Amino acid sequence: VFFEPMIHHVVKAVQPLDAEHSVVMVGHQKEAVEHALTRFNLSCVEQKEQNGTGHAVLCAEASLRDFHGTVLILCGDSPLLLTEHLKEMLNVHSSADTPLTIVTTSLENPQNYGRIITDNAGSVLEVVEEKDATDEQRTIKEINAGIYCVEKEFLFKALRQVTTDNSQGEMYLTDIVAIAVRNGFRVEKYEHPVPDHVLGVNSRVELSQ
């Protein structure tokens, strides 16, 4: 993307945040990804079994053993992310009394994205992936952008409660939203002002867009 590996754009968006640790999960073609990241001050951790996004984050636990604070989780296939929006999200999270903040946005065509389920007051209850959603839930236009601010202590406790009881038989990272609510926490959300900036790239067609 713009003559650079896609993940470079994500890493560069994060760099000005001065994170204590930066960890990249690798799996498919891990050697190529690791080679592309040699110029950056970060560590790579392999997800040997492709068992879902929740499992991928769980694989990073050992790398964060000595860290205590806020974990920012992003997808490596969102090359249009801007530092300014990540800073805004971090500010929203730090000013809220919550262990978890998620980024949402609204799309006219939300196909393939997890839907944000809220109560009548607009409070976030859960994220339902498209393959697990009912027909009614699929009409929801507010989607999960796949970016999270999570307090580390809550994150790994919650991930141990995630199951593979879903249509894809995987550990969904999105399940930590419902787990937070179930444990009496309010989940904050940052509504991204530019939907196109958080869209992922899963094909050459999406890349061209």
Model regions and ranges:
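Conserved N-terminal catalytic core of the sugar/cofactor nucleotidyltransferase
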Residues: 5-91
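Short, high-confidence coil segments that cap the C-terminus of an alpha-helix
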Residues: 19, 68, 95-100, 185
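Structural beta-sheet core signal
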Residues: 23-24, 72-73, 100-103, 189
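A conserved hydrophobic position in a structured secondary element of the catalytic/binding core
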Residues: 28, 81, 119, 150-151, ...
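His/Asp/Glu-rich metal-coordinating catalytic cores
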Residues: 71, 76, 84, 103, ...
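Conserved donor-nucleotide/metal-binding helix-loop-beta segment in metal-dependent transferases, i.e.
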Residues: 84-111
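Rossmann-like NAD(P)H-binding beta-loop-alpha module
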Residues: 105-136
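Catalytic-core segments of class I nucleotidyltransferases/pyrophosphorylases
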Residues: 124-198, 202-209
